[in-house]
């Protein structure tokens, strides 16, 4: 199992963790913070889009690839643009709040479509491995999402929970 560390800026300043950490998860919406030669999992940026508004799948991927180009690296892994089910906007601020079950099915469908979109571009994204996100507000939804994504995934892909 490989663990990719995110939000390292705060931890590194306090604990000087760079010598031990080799795998980082970066968001295309934030300033990258990883040592030279680190292995990068490039997140979709969907978390920040809860506040800004969602992109299309293509816009999300273009943002990820532009981020790589700007910062001169190629990710080891790249994440699909799933629809997060535990973040909502309330009165101009993002809060941690799980969606209702009925609304959760929309997130499942959108997340499966995001994985399909990325899988269709597998060859052009090489050598990056795909991280196919899964969502759901309950076990039935997660099972539906994971099962559908397993149908389109390749053995070298990762499932993101």
Locations of the language-model features?
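Non-catalytic, usually N-terminal nucleic-acid engagement modules in DNA/RNA processing proteins
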Residues: 1-119, 123
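Glycine/Thr-rich beta-alpha phosphate-binding loop at enzyme active sites
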Residues: 95-104, 129-161
């Amino acid at each position: 199992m490989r663990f990719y560390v995110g939000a390292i800026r705060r931890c590194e300043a306090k604990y000087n963790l760079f010598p031990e950490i080799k795998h980082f998860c970066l968001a295309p919406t934030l300033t990258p913070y990883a040592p030279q030669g680190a292995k990068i999992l490039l997140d979709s940026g969907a978390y920040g889009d809860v506040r800004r508004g969602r992109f299309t799948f293509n816009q999300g991927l273009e943002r990820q690839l532009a981020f790589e180009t700007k910062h001169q690296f190629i990710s080891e892994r790249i994440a699909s643009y799933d629809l997060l089910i535990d973040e909502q906007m309330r009165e101009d601020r993002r809060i941690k709040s799980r969606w209702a079950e009925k609304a959760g099915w929309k997130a499942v469908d959108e997340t499966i479509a995001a994985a399909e979109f990325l899988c269709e571009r597998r060859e052009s994204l090489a050598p990056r491995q795909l991280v196919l996100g899964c969502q759901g507000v309950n076990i039935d939804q997660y099972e539906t999402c994971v099962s559908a994504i397993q149908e389109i995934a390749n053995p070298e892909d990762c499932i993101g929970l």
